[in-house]
Amino acid sequence: MLIEDIFKALADTTRLRIARLLGTMELAVGELAQVLGQSQPRVSRHVGILCDAGLAERRREGSWVFLRQSEARGEVIEAIQHLLVTAEAEEPAFAALCEADRRKLAAIRQARE
């Protein structure tokens, strides 16, 4: 995958939020849709772009599709996660989105248990 494809895939706030969430745990598309407050088809489209760029991977379990960070691009993924953590620390608007996402994700994790 070309670096240009990776940057294009990350050139959207929703996809940045998805990448940040996948850095914490594996999630189903429906769970991502809940956290992001967007429709499942819309989230699936964003996930497809991340997968096409090699930044995320799908895993099927029955009728569920789970997503996780790509393991094939370890150093690239690590650098992207570092960049996202730094952006969250320095960009108040992105930090607010990430904090809201974490609160919603915590509720989803609790429901899983």
Question: Model-flagged regions — what are they?
Answer:
Residues L2, E75-E113:
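Amphipathic alpha-helical dimerization/coiled-coil segments
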Residues L2-P41, W64-G74:
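N-terminal helix-turn-helix DNA-binding core of bacterial DNA-binding proteins
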Residues Q34, R45, C51-D52:
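Alpha-helical residues within the helix-turn-helix
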Residues V43-H46, R59, Q110:
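Positively charged, low-complexity intrinsically disordered regions
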Residues D52-E61, R68-S70:
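Beta-hairpin "wing" of winged helix-turn-helix
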